[in-house]
């Protein structure tokens, strides 16, 4: 791993193997049985997954001294926009964050209506 010493690489690999083992110890539930039984198995599986996720975060923070999630990306104070002055295609939207509904020409809309 670039920029790290060999010792911390070994520790990181050991930690990743441990976390991988935790996730592998909780396979997805089977799809057999009644709807209620399947629902209960999925609910218990999701609860175990949440528990494994919290244990993994604890392992990462305590043994490696780093948070489980990366540090959030700091965005510039001004809004990010895309310049659509060039050909942007015919997707029916313009710009970012302001979806436009693609409107068909009136002749197409009128062809199927009876007045």
Curated annotation (Swiss-Prot):
This is Protein Rev. One of its GO terms (biological process) is mRNA transport. One of its GO terms (molecular function) is DNA-binding transcription factor activity. Coiled coil: none annotated. A motif (Nuclear export signal and binding to XPO1) lies at residues 73-83. HIV-1 lineages are divided in three main groups, M (for Major), O (for Outlier), and N (for New, or Non-M, Non-O). The vast majority of strains found worldwide belong to the group M. Group O seems to be endemic to and largely confined to Cameroon and neighboring countries in West Central Africa, where these viruses represent a small minority of HIV-1 strains. The group N is represented by a limited number of isolates from Cameroonian persons. The group M is further subdivided in 9 clades or subtypes (A to D, F to H, J and K). Keywords: AIDS, Host cytoplasm, Host nucleus, Host-virus interaction, Methylation, mRNA transport, Phosphoprotein, RNA-binding, Transport. The keyword RNA-binding applies. The modification Phosphoserine is found at residues 5, 8, 91, 98. The keyword Phosphoprotein applies. Residues 36-48 have a biased composition (Basic residues). It is found in: Host nucleus, Host nucleolus; Host cytoplasm. Homomultimer; when bound to the RRE. Multimeric assembly is essential for activity and may involve XPO1. Binds to human KPNB1, XPO1, TNPO1, RANBP5 and IPO7. Interacts with the viral Integrase. Interacts with human KHDRBS1. Interacts with human NAP1; this interaction decreases Rev multimerization and stimulates its activity. Interacts with human DEAD-box helicases DDX3 and DDX24; these interactions may serve for viral RNA export to the cytoplasm and packaging, respectively. Asymmetrically arginine dimethylated at one site by host PRMT6. Methylation impairs the RNA-binding activity and export of viral RNA from the nucleus to the cytoplasm. Phosphorylated by protein kinase CK2. Presence of, and maybe binding to the N-terminus of the regulatory beta subunit of CK2 is necessary for CK2-mediated Rev's phosphorylation. Escorts unspliced or incompletely spliced viral pre-mRNAs (late transcripts) out of the nucleus of infected cells. These pre-mRNAs carry a recognition sequence called Rev responsive element (RRE) located in the env gene, that is not present in fully spliced viral mRNAs (early transcripts). This function is essential since most viral proteins are translated from unspliced or partially spliced pre-mRNAs which cannot exit the nucleus by the pathway used by fully processed cellular mRNAs. Rev itself is translated from a fully spliced mRNA that readily exits the nucleus. Pfam families: REV. Residues 23-48, 89-115 are annotated as: Disordered. Gene3D superfamilies: 6.10.140.630. Belongs to the HIV-1 REV protein family.
């Amino acid at each position: 791993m670039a920029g790290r010493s060999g010792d911390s690489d070994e520790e990181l690999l050991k930690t990743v193997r441990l976390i991988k083992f935790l996730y592998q110890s909780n396979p997805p539930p089977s799809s057999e049985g009644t709807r209620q039984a399947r629902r209960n198995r999925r609910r218990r599986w999701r609860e175990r997954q949440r528990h494994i996720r919290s244990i993994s975060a604890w392992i990462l923070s305590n043994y490696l001294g780093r948070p489980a999630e990366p540090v959030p990306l700091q965005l510039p104070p001004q809004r990010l926009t895309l310049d659509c002055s060039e050909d942007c295609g015919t997707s029916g939207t313009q710009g970012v964050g302001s979806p436009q509904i693609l409107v068909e020409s009136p002749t197409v809309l009128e062809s199927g209506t009876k007045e």
